[in-house]
Amino acid sequence: MPSDRPFKQRRSFADRCKEVQQIRDQHPSKIPVIIERYKGEKQLPVLDKTKFLVPDHVNMSELVKIIRRRLQLNPTQAFFLLVNQHSMVSVSTPIADIYEQEKDEDGFLYMVYASQETFGF
């Protein structure tokens, strides 16, 4: 079971930077992404892991499908994937473009997921 603490609190900045460098050296066509459940989320389950290496050609709609499948959600369950806890990006946007615009200073791309109700829509 993953820790309740966010990834950034479990690893030092230096360790995260080093890990990204190793990932990018070994897998230059993969984007290092951290996906965690939104802190106030109650309806959606917790993912079995938080770190993903996403092929750079994948777009957001494909990533959403992958995460929905990992969470074993049914088609009617609301699901939102936000970049840096605030940005909803177009589902057609390639993950490589999002990475270039939104990556953290440690080199990871951070995302959170939540159900629609969490944001009061």
Curated annotation (Swiss-Prot):
Changing H57D: Enhances binding to RETREG1. This is Microtubule-associated protein 1 light chain 3 alpha. 3 different light chains, LC1 (a cleavage product of MAP1B), LC2 (a cleavage product of MAP1A) and LC3 (produced by one of the MAP1LC3 genes), can associate with the MAP1A or MAP1B heavy chains. Interacts with TP53INP1 and TP53INP2. Directly interacts with SQSTM1; this interaction leads to MAP1LC3A recruitment to inclusion bodies containing polyubiquitinated protein aggregates and to inclusion body degradation by autophagy. Interacts with ATG13. Interacts with ULK1. Interacts with TBC1D5. Found in a complex with UBQLN1 and UBQLN2. Interacts with UBQLN4 (via STI1 1 and 2 domains). The precursor molecule is cleaved by ATG4 (ATG4A, ATG4B, ATG4C or ATG4D) to expose the glycine at the C-terminus and form the cytosolic form, LC3-I. The processed form is then activated by APG7L/ATG7, transferred to ATG3 and conjugated to phosphatidylethanolamine (PE) phospholipid to form the membrane-bound form, LC3-II. During non-canonical autophagy, the processed form is conjugated to phosphatidylserine (PS) phospholipid. ATG4 proteins also mediate the delipidation of PE-conjugated forms. Residues 49-53 are annotated as: Important for interaction with ATG13 and for autophagosome formation. It comes from Homo sapiens (Human). Most abundant in heart, brain, liver, skeletal muscle and testis but absent in thymus and peripheral blood leukocytes. Residues 121 form a propeptide.
